[in-house]
Amino acid sequence: MDYSNFGNSASKKFQDDTLNRVRKEHEEALKKLREENFSSNTSELGNKKHYRAQERMSSPLHRLSPTGKSDDRKVKSPLDDKLRRQLREGNTRLPPPPFSSYGMPPTNRSNLDRIRRRTSSPVRTDKFASQNVIDDQRLEIKYLERIVYDQGTVIDNLTSRITRLESFILNSISDRGDKNFASLEHSRSFSGFPTNKTYGLQMGGLYENDMPYRRSSDNINKEGAREDRSSQIHIENESTEDILKILSSSFHN
């Protein structure tokens, strides 16, 4: 019997058996991890499921390593610099890590918890929720701006209508002249409001011979007796109350 390669063949057979067992465990763990976090059809995506320590496998690197280094449990993270940069730049799903990352002891946080936390991406959900709030606020601001614009349009239309009404009334009074049979009644306490026959009525007040009208004794004598004047003013399509409001506002201005 040739014993020259006995040690090498036995060692190789042991390593093959170990690798086959590790691959089988890795496939089972990978299948379990995909069912939890890498299925886009499940509604449970992102929920944290805590594993017990018995469910974790010991690291295959530790099983294949010499016995003197069993206490050294610090293994490099499966995320290299390229994947970390991609994770920072955009929320992309991470590929399954190499099997050497499985079975890490629960020091601080295990690799499984870290991968599960990053693939579930709760930050992405919060970001989308805040963006929806911002969009709703922008729509509300646009709606309020539209209301303000509509109210401004209504105010402009009312202002233009009032201006046209004032000009129509004042032109009607000044154009009638001798044909106007009406005048406003005034008492001694009132500073005086002349008849349209004697004084021309213009925007902003009363004028006599291109000069502002001022009440005096001459004006009183010029107007004649109080009983000779009518106490109402007649303008087509307008009430006396509206005319008095417009005339009083222009008189005070």
Curated annotation (Swiss-Prot):
Q: In its keyword annotation, does this UniProt entry include Nucleus?
A: yes
Example of a GO cellular component annotation carried by this entry: cytoplasm
Q: Which domain of life is it from?
A: Eukaryota
Residues with PTM Phosphothreonine: T18, T240
**What function is annotated for this protein?**
Component of the spindle pole body (SPB) required for the proper execution of spindle pole body (SPB) duplication. Links the central plaque component SPC42 to the inner plaque component SPC110.
UniProt-annotated stretches for the region Disordered: 1-20, 31-123, 210-231
Among InterPro entries, the record links this protein to: Spc29
Q: Which stretches are tagged as biased composition: Polar residues?
A: 1-12
Organism, scientific name: Saccharomyces cerevisiae (strain ATCC 204508 / S288c)
Gene Ontology terms: biological process: mitotic spindle pole body duplication; regulation of microtubule nucleation
The protein's name in its UniProt record? Spindle pole component 29
Q: Where in the cell is it found?
A: Nucleus; Cytoplasm, Cytoskeleton, Microtubule organizing center, Spindle pole body
Quaternary structure annotation from Swiss-Prot or TrEMBL:
Component of the SPC110 complex containing at least CMD1, SPC29, SPC42 and SCP110. Interacts with BBP1.
PTM annotation, UniProt: MPS1-mediated phosphorylation at Thr-240 is required for spindle pole body duplication.
> What's the family?
Belongs to the SPC29 family.
**Which controlled-vocabulary keywords does the entry list?**
Cytoplasm, Cytoskeleton, Nucleus, Phosphoprotein
Give an example GO molecular function.
identical protein binding
